[in-house]
Structures are given as C-alpha cells and as structure tokens.
C-alpha cells in the first residue's frame, strides 16, 4: 500500500513539474505583436534628474530641486534648493531630501514642504518617518552624531557616537512613527 501511494505521489509531482515547465516555456517564447500606449508624459528635465515612486505618483529630484507629480504628469508641488549630492528617503506619505556631505535637509509630504533642518556638520545619511520626522547621521572630527528632527526641522535630540565608545553608525533606520531608532 505504501509503495502504491509513493508511486502516485511521484507521478503527481512529475505531472506538476512538467506543467510548470511547459507553461514557463510558452510564456518565455510568447511573441507580442502589438502594444497600446495608455499614457505618456513629456520629460523636459536635465540628465541628472532622478525619479522615485512616491505616494500615488512620483518624485523627480536633482541638484537644483525636487518636484512631486501625479502619475498623470500633473505637478503637485515643486521646491528649489541647491545641493551637491541630494539623497532621498521615503516612508509612507513623507519624503526627506538631504545634501550628503552638505548641511541641509528638507521634509515633505504629499501637500508640499513641511520643514527644513540646517546642520552645523556634514550630513552622511538621512532617514524619514511616516510622520515626517527626520533622523540624520552627522560627521564631526572625532565623533558622529545621530540627530532627530521634528516635522518643522527643529532638533529633538542628538546622540554622540565615537569609535572608541559605541562605534560609528554604518546605517540607521527609524520606525514609521519615529519612536524607534536602529
């Protein structure tokens, strides 16, 4: 009886594997003969612009500014700035952009700019929570600092890290409610 069950199970497995193989070959070799354009947007930007999905649209950012667009291409908001190396962080409906090795960071939501933080030390990393609070790793001569900023860009707290003490942070992350820093 056990050998009969084993044979039936083996046959079923072989049939399933064969079906998966045949379907994957058909999909891989399918030749599309036409397409339909459902929407298009003209891009009139510089080559250094980068795009990233955000909320129910996308964000375009570069050294000169950041803009939020709906998927239809309609501009919702636009903010100019001057950054050498902009880096973005997204969490839910909040986005932060900071000038890496610079000293400014901006916080936005789907309605526009919420806050701006100016630092006295170079920014190494930026993270944002869903509520718009920002955490930044800052570089000093003998230490690094992890600063938390509220939605308006005001510093909430600062944690000093040294190589001989806690070590330098390689990466940070904050929870969506900004209550946990890792």
Model-derived regions: residue spans:
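Repeated scaffold domains used in trafficking and secretory/extracellular systems
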Residues: 44-53, 82-93, 121-132, 166-173
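Structural motif
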Residues: 65-67, 103-106, 142-148
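A short beta-strand motif characteristic of beta-propeller blades
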Residues: 31-44, 73-80, 112-118, 155-163
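Extracytoplasmic/periplasmic/luminal assembly and interaction segments
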Residues: 50-101
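Hydrophobic beta-strand positions that form the internal "hydrophobic ladder"
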Residues: 58, 95, 134-135, 178-181
């Amino acid at each position: 009886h056990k050998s009969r069950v084993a044979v039936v199970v083996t046959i079923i497995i072989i049939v399933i594997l064969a079906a998966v193989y045949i379907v994957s070959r058909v999909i891989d070799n399918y030749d599309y003969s036409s397409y339909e354009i459902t929407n298009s947007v003209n891009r009139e930007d510089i080559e250094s612009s980068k795009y990233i999905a955000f909320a129910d649209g996308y964000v375009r950012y570069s050294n000169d500014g950041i803009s939020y667009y709906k998927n239809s291409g309609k501009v919702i908001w636009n903010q100019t700035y001057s950054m050498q190396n902009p880096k973005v962080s997204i969490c839910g409906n909040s986005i932060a952009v900071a000038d890496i090795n610079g000293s400014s960071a901006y916080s936005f939501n789907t309605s526009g700019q919420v806050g701006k933080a100016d630092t006295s030390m170079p920014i190494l990393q930026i993270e944002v929570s869903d509520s718009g609070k920002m955490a930044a790793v800052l570089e000093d001569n003998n230490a690094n600092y992890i600063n938390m900023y509220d939605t308006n860009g005001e510093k909430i707290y600062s944690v000093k890290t040294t190589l001989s003490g806690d070590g330098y942070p390689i990466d940070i992350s904050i929870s969506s409610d900004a209550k946990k820093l890792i």
